[in-house]
Amino acid sequence: MAGDSETHLKDRAENGHAVRQPFLIGVSGGTASGKSSVCEKIMELLGQNKIDRHQRQVVILSQDSFYRELTPEQKAKAVKGQFNFDHPDAFDSELIMKTLRDIIQGKTVHIPVYDFVTHSRKDEFLTLYPADVVLFEGILMFYSQEIRDLFKMKLFVDTDPDTRLSRRVLRDISERGRELEQVLNQYITFVKPAFEEFCLPTKKYADVIIPRGADNLVAINLIVQHIQDILNGGFTKRQNGFQNGHGTPRQRRTSESSRPH
């Protein structure tokens, strides 16, 4: 519960213990470039995907969870494939900022669950517990400077456009109930122009560019090693004050001591 994490943080603060901010990693790239697959591969190589959600040191967030609620008129367009889901205005940036700030403060947060078939938010939430590393993926993660500046590492998944289109066609037909003609029209009308205008220009902000997505194990292994340094040896260095400006160690509950390191 959110109240539990807030009480825990308050108790630690009153006892003079500093709380380290989580390490936020932004993962951007075009539609169906493999952003989710890269994040999942990182989780797998770290062994975090087999750990209970309450105990994970690394968690994944998706910008897709933060699509705005559509008006009846917008929803009617969406059903026909005539609504631009790749425009910055399609996302609830205010909620993204609030969520990121809460995560930075070590709070438990509740993430909306979006239904791509009905184009609406479900009446349920995903609970995200405090973690040491947060991977936040989405097509426009680096578009807003306010959001972009919160990431301590920025990754851009760079995949061939033809590969991305073929993946999107297969995904939208099999998972989202779309017709082929609708998927192609939407890609030509909205997706491709939006990528070129809003997503591709943000590639310059990336610290690491990952060609071929999850197939690029060399790049992913380097990123995994960096995250392992944060989870393992990094803690020892930060115990002494971590004077380089990245914060101090997040204090763990007794129940957290069993987490693998």
Curated annotation (Swiss-Prot):
Q: Name one Pfam family in it.
A: PRK
Cite the entry's keywords alphabetically: ATP-binding, Kinase, Nucleotide-binding, Transferase
Q: Where is the signal peptide?
A: none
Known pathway = Pyrimidine metabolism; CTP biosynthesis via salvage pathway; CTP from cytidine: step 1/3; Pyrimidine metabolism; UMP biosynthesis via salvage pathway; UMP from uridine: step 1/1
Keyword check for Chaperone = no
Which leading EC class covers this enzyme?
transferase
List positions binding ATP: 29-37, 215
Annotated region (Disordered) at 238-261
Query: Subunit details for this protein?
Result: Homotetramer.
Query: What is the protein's given name?
Result: Uridine-cytidine kinase 2-B
